């Protein structure tokens, strides 16, 4: 699409979102567009430090979990000594960026608002690790903690998955993988999905939105996909293009959150409409005036905190509902 035909989203953002876009961190160098992947990962970690500051304090524990691909680092956030459920978190970053530190504040707030133990999974990044490794690592982590629950004071009778952006895809894909492969790790009571991508190759929102401000141009999205997938055939896999999976039955309740000016918003809309059409429990909420990745900015955006609390409320309600 000709760039001039795109919607000028920067003029339509909320005041909070504009403040974030215009905020300059002192001493932060520009994004290393021409740097290699390791340089970009280090920059992303540095840039996110400000946004992760002043997070709630709570007991945390790091654990290396054995998987078929080697040990995967996890971090357990325990807001209280006992927990009614366990929530696994998959971070975003286009499959190529991010770790437990870049999303630390999000996980701490989610633990605080749910009152549950949140386990962040530092899955292997692409292109070094290709589909479906991150999903299989996530499943291995769930299996490990289901077998060692007493050792970590976990309640794994009720579990959930949560994630933002690429992590949202991994969260839903992992839950479907457990269902499809008949792997028992606990009763999946809910999945919390913030502005994920779920398999669309093109859409109205992907044409109208996306630019240098969010790193989600068509070229960017193609790059993330090529880094993650092994080959072109993987695009149609039911655990990548989740719309090719069976969404008509036994899908855990989904909280589906989107950002108004996100190129990926149509993925969330289609997911919601598909689940709703087949009477699968779900809730959809769009956060006006926001860009993709707004969940990171709760230090400056009350709506980011609202989005986390909305997901937490959804999860807590499912803790009380027999399934």
Swiss-Prot record:
Gene3D superfamilies: alpha/beta hydrolase. Its main location: cytoplasm. GO terms for cellular component: cytoplasm. Its EC number is 3.1.1.-. It is found in: Cytoplasm. Keywords: Cytoplasm, Hydrolase, Serine esterase. The active site is at 165, 262, 292. It comes from the Bacteria. One of its GO terms (molecular function) is carboxylic ester hydrolase activity. InterPro entries: AB_hydrolase_3, AB_hydrolase_fold, Acetyl_esterase, GDXG_lipolytic_enzyme, Lipase_GDXG_put_SER_AS. Homodimer. Interacts with MalT and MelA. Belongs to the 'GDXG' lipolytic enzyme family. This is Acetyl esterase. It comes from Salmonella newport (strain SL254).
